[in-house]
């Protein structure tokens, strides 16, 4: 009888726990960069109505929610300042080639070619040559009308 080699490729408890920890950190970072989906937004033609009371993320400056439109594009509604004039709406398609931008730090980035935009859509770095498209916004009480 010879000595048999153990070819079992099982993982140690430590390597499993390290893997779980790395996964948790990765998921929490991704969630921190994701915009909250707007609650109760309604689209009628080219107008969108949003209830501020249902979208608590817009209560503080820097807060934002995302609205996915019927045409496949997305908008970000952003609290840029206090008061009724402190709400902005931008299209989340890069102005370079139309690729959806993603939340990156305190702004937006195009994953295709690296264009960078501020939180309110201003162009920071190309190859895009213009800011993200903005939409007119009016606020009456708790109601936001976009478009």
Describe each region flagged by the PLM:
Residues 2-27:
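N-terminal secretory signal peptides and thylakoid transit peptides that target proteins
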Residues 10, 49, 88, 111, ...:
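Short aromatic/basic micro-patch
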Residues 20, 62, 114:
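Short amphipathic alpha-helical/adjacent loop interface patches that line ligand
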Residues 28-32:
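Hydrophobic membrane-targeting alpha-helices
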Residues 33-95, 99-104, 134-147:
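N-terminal pre-ligand scaffold of iron-sulfur
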Residues 108-114, 124-132:
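Short cysteine/histidine-rich metal-coordination sites, predominantly Zn2+-binding motifs
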Residues 118:
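Short, acidic, Ser/Thr-enriched surface-loop or helix-capping motifs
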């Amino acid at each position: 009888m010879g000595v048999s080699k153990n070819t079992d490729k099982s993982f140690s408890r430590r390597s499993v726990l390290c893997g779980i920890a790395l996964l948790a950190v990765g998921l929490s970072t991704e969630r921190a960069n994701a915009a909250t989906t707007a609650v109760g937004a309604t689209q009628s033609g080219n107008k969108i109505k949003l209830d501020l009371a249902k979208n608590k993320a817009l209560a503080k400056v820097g807060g934002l929610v995302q609205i996915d439109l019927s045409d496949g594009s997305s908008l970000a509604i952003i609290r840029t300042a206090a008061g009724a004039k402190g709400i902005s709406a931008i299209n989340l398609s890069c102005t370079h080639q139309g690729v959806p931008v993603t939340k990156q730090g305190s702004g937006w980035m195009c994953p295709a070619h690296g264009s960078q935009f501020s939180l309110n859509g201003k162009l920071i770095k190309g190859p895009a040559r213009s800011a993200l498209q903005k939409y007119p916004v009016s606020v009456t009480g708790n109601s936001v009308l976009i478009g």
